[in-house]
Amino acid sequence: MKVIDEKPEDEEEEKDSGSKCKTPSSCTKKRVREKEEDLPPICHGWLIVCEGNPTKMMNKEVKLPWHAGYCVFEPRQSTMSCYKQEYPFIAGRMLHRNRTVRMDGDRSAFARHWGLLPEHYPSPPITGPHTIARSYTRPPKDRLPTKERFFSISRIPSRLTKFSTVRGMSIEFFDAIHDETNSGGAQVGGESLDRRGWSGASTGNRTTLTASVHNNLMNGRMSSSSHNLSTRLSGSTQNLNQPTNAYGNLLSRPFRSNPLKRTKSVSKMEKSLAEANQHSLHRVDASNTPSRDSSLYAQPPARRHLSQPAREGSLRACRSHESLLSSAHSTHMIELNEDNRLHPVHPSIFEVPNCFRLASTYYSCRTPLERAKWMENLRKTMNPRRDQQRRTENSMLIWILEAKGLPAKRKYYCEMTLDKTLYAKTSSKARTDNVFWGENFEFMMLPKIDEVCVSLFRESDSKKKKDTLIGYVTIGIDQLSSRSPVERWYTVNTSHSDSGTSRIASALGGKSSSQESPSLRIKARWQSVHILPLRAYDNLLETLCYNYLPLCEQLEPVLNVRDKEDLATSLVRVMYKHNLAKEFLCDLIMKEVEKLDNDHLMFRGNTLATKAMESFMKLVADDYLDSTLSDFIKTVLQCEDSCEVDPQKLGNVSNSSLEKNRALLMRYVEVAWTKILNNVHQLPKNLRDVFSALRCRLEAQNREALADTLISSSIFLRFLCPAILSPSLFNLVSEYPSPTNARNLTLIAKTLQNLANFSKFGGKEPHMEFMNEFVDREWHRMKDFLLRISSESKSGPEKNADAIVDAGKELSLIATYLEEAWTPLLQEKNGNKHPLSNVKSVLSELAECKRRSDNGVFHSPMVQQPSSDYENSPQQHVVPRHENVPAYRSTPPTGQATVLGRSTNRPATHLLTSDDYVLSSAFQTPSLRPGGTRLSDETGTSSSRTSDKTTSSAEIRDDTDSDFELREDRGRGGRNRKRLPRTDASPSSSQQASSGYLSNNPSRSSYSNSSSSSPVERMAALSIANPVFGPGPSSGYAIPAEPKEIVYQKRASPPPYDPDVHNYHYQPMQVYAVPPDCQVSPRTQATGGVNAQNRLSLPRTNPRASRNSTLLRPSVVNVPDDWDRTSDYWRDRGENNYRSQLESQVESQAREIERLMRENIELKSKMMSSTKTVDSKRSDSGASEDSYDSLSSLDRPSRQSLVVVPN
């Protein structure tokens, strides 16, 4: 129906543009493509994959089966698949039909990063399919023909030394890399595939080796951790005279001894069909058994290998002997529409960098940016409504600084657990005076936690399996929820039992109780950011984009250094997200340059401009910094030689030792400077554009001499030299350097900074004057370097650096910072005509939105899920506003009342139990209804006897058929849904019917405890002196006599609406006028009387709702037979008639509302003039407590004082 309605509009647009859809299907496909543009692109690339489900580290090196896999993430299918090879069929299909993003660059970049570049070796000995090739003599590769060369990995790569086992990659992977390398990357063809149904099968030698073969052979554990090697040759089996042929014959298994028998082959037609369908993957079936090749792939028990068809699949299982022996091409596939966990993994857990976890599989990327891209696209698919809903992002920053009170025995380390889940560990450090770590850890995408536990361990000797637990420190999360990090000493807790005390005492070397107990110095901060829907920040974003310069000028004097850094970081990220980073930085920096008196003090102070530039370089140039200085820093830290050249710090040393240190320092500085010069092409274009704009602005002001100083202060003083001085703060290394290495890095950074400042050593540092020779020699190269990074590239277009920014989180942080800093003095200073005059109103609006449980302006549904995306579930149960009930559409704009058919004596099966439909038994007359007696006054107080499963708050009810069960029912397609009992309308029932809408109002009224008006309650509120919307019965039922008395309120109106008490905000429901051709039965003007009250209590289909109020049933009107509600009826009437009808309905509604308001004002004045009270009886006007609030024209009746006016 939606396609039919949109089709004429689309055709008109295409006619205007000169292009018309040839067929309706082409228009439909066009709309589908437009909708698919909102989905994340297809991401694919090589990753290091671990298919396991580890629980903890066990204080030892984790041994998991890491291997290289070609991963494909398809957002349309919501799947994450992993393959052994990069198939041309998959790559070609994605490139031609979908938007794709290559995450790893290319195969050669992946291989170079992980040290998997191929080497040429002669053919290995012929072995069986389940044996391992050994090392042998390798003749020079120049003397071998191409077809006899053998590609393998001779050793574990340097970047994979922390992996316990790394699976081998196929020969085709290295063959393709070799071709790309030799041809300069011009060949982009696919890899040769095996003969199991894939086109382009290769001929010749095809071998897969294990990356850890050499390491396992050297350590004598070849058979325990090494994987199998499969060798297949094009010809028959040959025996080569090689030194390791004896091992191959010993370990090989002949074919006739294999217990698997070869069956008859399937027909050619079935075989071709199976090969054609081989590209499609089956879903994960948790009920099937693990793969037969579990020793090779270590599949978790809950996985089914994708080489086996699904239980209900259409493909037949392959029955050939060769297929059972060989492994499948695809290792696993994860469906993202299940309850999966996605979160980053700290590198200290598995000693694997840039790792993240999805379900029970771990993936390791090349760079942090690559991991951020993978996770961002996965999060968008798992939670597509993230920017349209309220959410909470939790993060934690913790520093493990040092420990004292420990004996000088072996090394110590700490493990950090959040709610008994291990997240990270420190390095092992030996005690000097104190055990100093100085390591910081940042955890993102955290769930809501209660406590942080830091456990202190001491490494044991090689004979023991486990390390010794010294003690632990437990910190409540409420102690860390502050604006700035909390730093203090924490006493290490030990066990209170006798055995525990003796164990701790023995671990501490038998210390007496009089000695100092161990303690840890920890600094930590817990941050929980509450984020509104993204469109709620439109006014704030507009203010920031148009008035960021006056805003920074006003906040500069009132912020401290820490606040400046936080605000500048968030501002830079928001401007980068909206492509305004260059203008923002240039305006801010030039404003500071204009105020600067001394050019030599450029970027020396801690201002918003310097902090913003520093944050921008960290955001876009993180990969550049890692590729430039990471290897150099690690080399310096591995060397224990000192570069100290100050004779006062060295003491009595010989001249030869001093000259040796000078030569080592000179060599280090030259290596660092050379790496910076050689990597100038990797500097991001975003940063070059900023430097180029700054140079152009200075040249326009005739201050060209200041350009080099400004640019060198930015790149060296704020980025490169601080990274050399403190590499752990820039994530170049994880450990804090030793005192000797820290001094070496300080001298290196000091020399490069003097070169960037174009100044020589002397005066206060005479011991560094020997480096003036280096400064003079590299002076002109520094000028050339600064000119190159601040000029447009002439080699061609360059790509901008990518960065993942959460705009909602940053805008929420900016709002928080402004609320703290925007004082009344600043608001008074910025008058009405000032550009910042609306800052206070914008902040007040956001504060009001955050304070309320929901906002009717944005109509953003709350999603019942964890506070962050740590546990994402795409099958989210959307809760409208703050109620814990499903959302349904309001009545369509036809003006008709819905009439139920014959009674089925049970709720409708297609409706949820929280729906607000009335059973047909409600329309029975009092004479026909069983037990039709009058409802007593105690009916309104029967809520004290309601079921425990009934709640009147907006909190999640775990003891009822909650939304989680509803999600399960929806996931099962509605099968096996639990039938809930109906309520009875008799007075003896302990549960009274209600509308099924919940309340946050703590005060329970006898009239209604609902704070969100239901459709029936709104109709009842409008029914006061309104014959159209009245809840009276239809013409087929008896009409009660006119009441003898009318109840009015005695005392004055209650206090006005207080949001602190009624912290709800409902969405006004649309009220449609009844068409004129519908026959509406007459009704009475009042609701008093025995029979009237008896008919007003209606049985509902919602047993969970509160039952302490009586409600009026909706009006029942006679719908003519010729009233057609189908789409054909509206289509035939024409657009003009339909529009005129809508306008008439709106006008009639407006007139009806105005009339109701006038009558309600008159009724209010009469109620205020009455003086008599009612002792025992009360009357229900049909309007709920919330209906009075919604109309804003009626006052709540009093529970205690009511007056009666005689007729």
From Swiss-Prot:
CDD domains: C2_SynGAP_like, RasGAP_DAB2IP
Biased composition (Polar residues): 237-247, 286-297, 495-504, 862-876, 891-903
Alphabetized Pfam families for the sequence: C2, PH_RASGAP, RasGAP
Residue ranges occupied by any C2 domain in the UniProt entry: 374-490
Molecular function GO terms recorded: GTPase activator activity
UniProt keyword Cytoplasm present: yes
Main location: cytoplasm
Compartmental location: Cytoplasm
Biased composition annotated in UniProt, kind: Basic and acidic residues: 955-972
InterPro entries registered for this protein in UniProt: C2_dom (IPR000008), C2_domain_sf (IPR035892), PH_domain (IPR001849), Ras_GTPase (IPR039360), RasGAP_CS (IPR023152), RasGAP_dom (IPR001936), Rho_GTPase_activation_prot (IPR008936)
Gene3D superfamilies the record matches: C2 domain, GTPase Activation - p120gap, domain 1
Signal peptide (from-to): none
SMART domains in UniProt: C2, PH, RasGAP
Sequence segments annotated as region (Disordered): 1-29, 221-316, 495-516, 856-903, 923-1013, 1086-1107, 1163-1207
Name of the molecule in the record: Ras GTPase-activating protein gap-2
Organism, as annotated: Caenorhabditis elegans
